[in-house]
Amino acid sequence: MHITYDLPVAIEDILEAKKRLAGKIYKTGMPRSNYFSERCKGEIFLKFENMQRTGSFKIRGAFNKLSSLTEAEKRKGVVACSAGNHAQGVSLSCAMLGIDGKVVMPKGAPKSKVAATCDYSAEVVLHGDNFNDTIAKVSEIVETEGRIFIPPYDDPKVIAGQGTIGLEIMEDLYDVDNVIVPIGGGGLIAGIAIAIKSINPTIKVIGVQAENVHGMAASYYTGEITTHRTTGTLADGCDVSRPGNLTYEIVRELVDDIVLVSEDEIRNSMIALIQRNKVITEGAGALACAALLSGKLDSHIQNRKTVSIISGGNIDLSRVSQITGLVDA
């Protein structure tokens, strides 16, 4: 028996996405972390989406969206824009489904993410310096080539695909008390919140954003969609200054809280994951654990069971060396 909410995505959409994704993606592991459990005085489980195909959760939403296109739409080809993880998810999904794909990435995108996107199948177009520049280029491609745009987060099928993580959490740890989720544009937390709250509304779903870029948190607390970005962040995968319209609506309705973490807290979380759990994550992937270590969630997590989403691990090795040389865990 599921609880139904009057929202753009329902638990039924996520269950349908699970069927589409069966055999196409990994059901990622979710082990208990002794280190984080001891530090946080609760039971902490890490959901390793950095071990997912393409190195992040993004393939879930990308494949669900692409596989739901009509045959006529598939023949037109698709286009997406991304700094990395969505690009890789779309590129691999195109290869799996036999769809011609084109991805627009900013000129400053990490070299490893550009290379991986090319390797999976899609044609990569490097354009502009930021998300607004890439969106403008995508609009031009849609107009001139007739391709179908695959949004990175603000789309019901994309949100439903990301929500399959919530189903896996409930399958593996039904008595979980809290789920801590990184936020960029909001697709991941929106999908997870629908899945979790439809099954058990007493479970808390808490978001985490970087202090430097927190459009969703600013919108959540002011009650209207707004933009927030002061400068860049180590969590470059979550460097989204304005949330999506659909994702904001879902987050406003279902998410229990959003906390902010500093750049030092993100860095220390990345180092702790490497040193204590032998796990390499990108900055965005370390956001949830940064919130756990910060003490800002102590009232929620002490003596309770908490899942922390490690959303991705696509980071240049040179960047890892730079980060680990700055701060001790």
UniProtKB/Swiss-Prot annotation:
<dbReference type="Pfam" id="PF00291">
    <property type="entry name" value="PALP"/>
</dbReference>
<dbReference type="GO" id="GO:0070689">
    <property type="term" value="P:L-threonine catabolic process to propionate"/>
</dbReference>
<feature type="binding site">
    <location>
        <position position="88"/>
    </location>
    <ligand>
        <name>AMP</name>
    </ligand>
</feature>
<comment type="subunit">
    <text>In the native structure, TdcB is in a dimeric form, whereas in the TdcB-AMP complex, it exists in a tetrameric form (dimer of dimers).</text>
</comment>
<keyword id="KW-0021">Allosteric enzyme</keyword>
<dbReference type="InterPro" id="IPR050147">
    <property type="entry name" value="Ser/Thr_Dehydratase"/>
</dbReference>
<feature type="binding site">
    <location>
        <begin position="53"/>
        <end position="54"/>
    </location>
    <ligand>
        <name>AMP</name>
    </ligand>
</feature>
<comment type="function">
    <text>Catalyzes the anaerobic formation of alpha-ketobutyrate and ammonia from threonine in a two-step reaction. The first step involved a dehydration of threonine and a production of enamine intermediates (aminocrotonate), which tautomerizes to its imine form (iminobutyrate). Both intermediates are unstable and short-lived. The second step is the nonenzymatic hydrolysis of the enamine/imine intermediates to form 2-ketobutyrate and free ammonia. In the low water environment of the cell, the second step is accelerated by RidA.</text>
</comment>
<comment type="pathway">
    <text>Amino-acid degradation; L-threonine degradation via propanoate pathway; propanoate from L-threonine: step 1/4.</text>
</comment>
<dbReference type="InterPro" id="IPR005789">
    <property type="entry name" value="Thr_deHydtase_catblc"/>
</dbReference>
<keyword id="KW-0547">Nucleotide-binding</keyword>
<feature type="modified residue" description="N6-(pyridoxal phosphate)lysine">
    <location>
        <position position="58"/>
    </location>
</feature>
<feature type="binding site">
    <location>
        <position position="314"/>
    </location>
    <ligand>
        <name>AMP</name>
    </ligand>
</feature>
<protein>
    <recommendedName>
        <fullName>L-threonine dehydratase catabolic TdcB</fullName>
        <ecNumber>4.3.1.19</ecNumber>
        <ecNumber>4.3.1.17</ecNumber>
    </recommendedName>
</protein>
<dbReference type="InterPro" id="IPR000634">
    <property type="entry name" value="Ser/Thr_deHydtase_PyrdxlP-BS"/>
</dbReference>
<dbReference type="GO" id="GO:0003941">
    <property type="term" value="F:L-serine ammonia-lyase activity"/>
</dbReference>
<keyword id="KW-0663">Pyridoxal phosphate</keyword>
<comment type="similarity">
    <text>Belongs to the serine/threonine dehydratase family.</text>
</comment>
<dbReference type="GO" id="GO:0000166">
    <property type="term" value="F:nucleotide binding"/>
</dbReference>
<dbReference type="GO" id="GO:0006565">
    <property type="term" value="P:L-serine catabolic process"/>
</dbReference>
<dbReference type="GO" id="GO:0030170">
    <property type="term" value="F:pyridoxal phosphate binding"/>
</dbReference>
<feature type="binding site">
    <location>
        <begin position="119"/>
        <end position="120"/>
    </location>
    <ligand>
        <name>AMP</name>
    </ligand>
</feature>
<dbReference type="InterPro" id="IPR001926">
    <property type="entry name" value="TrpB-like_PALP"/>
</dbReference>
<dbReference type="InterPro" id="IPR036052">
    <property type="entry name" value="TrpB-like_PALP_sf"/>
</dbReference>
<dbReference type="GO" id="GO:0004794">
    <property type="term" value="F:threonine deaminase activity"/>
</dbReference>
<keyword id="KW-0456">Lyase</keyword>
